[in-house]
Design a protein with these regions (language model features):
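Short, positionally conserved secondary-structure boundary motifs
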Residues: 1-53, 63-66, 125-128
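Glycine- and charge-enriched low-complexity intrinsically disordered segments
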Residues: 86-128
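A generic structural signal for residues embedded in beta-strands
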Residues: 59-60, 76
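Short, charged/polar surface micro-motifs in flexible loops or helix N-caps
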Residues: 45-48, 62-65, 79-82, 92-93, ...
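Short Pro/Gly-enriched beta-strand edge/turn motifs at strand-loop
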Residues: 68-70
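Residues located in well-ordered beta-strands
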Residues: 3, 41, 58, 83-86, ...
Length: 128
């Protein structure tokens, strides 16, 4: 079973939150994905229709120095908060490009030094 963090993407610093939350504060769920480490709820519509408001994503923290699967979806813990985006390289190795699935939202770049942690999205769950 893995913890469902009582925080959503686009809200505060994830690393600080994880350090402060107690295991007993978290709902726990069974996961069909053996490598999943935690569950995060998604808010907003920037990633619809792939990740809808209120869905939950199962994620695994990765070492961004080892390998980044460009073009895939990640939850990034950044200096500006937690975001879920499709991530692409830029011509500047010190920045990454964050792209929403919803074309109504413009892409933006984030300095690599402002990314505290990378979490690869392994699966999404939506309640019907």
């Amino acid at each position: 079973m893995i913890p469902v963090l009582p925080v959503s993407a686009q809200a505060g610093r994830l690393n600080e939150f994880i350090a402060q939350v107690n295991d007993y504060d978290c709902e726990r769920i069974f996961t069909p994905i053996p490598d999943a480490e935690m569950v995060i709820s998604i808010t907003g519509d920037s990633m619809t229709p792939e990740y809808v408001n209120g869905c939950r994503v199962l994620v695994k923290r990765i070492d961004d120095r080892a390998f980044i699967d460009w073009g895939k979806t990640y939850v990034l813990d950044t200096a500006s908060g937690v975001v879920i985006k499709n991530i692409f390289p830029t011509s500047d190795p010190a920045t990454v490009r964050c792209v929403s699935v919803n074309p109504a939202y413009p892409a933006f770049e984030v300095q690599a030094k402002d990314i505290y942690a990378w979490y690869k999205v392994l699966m999404s769950m939506t309640m019907k």
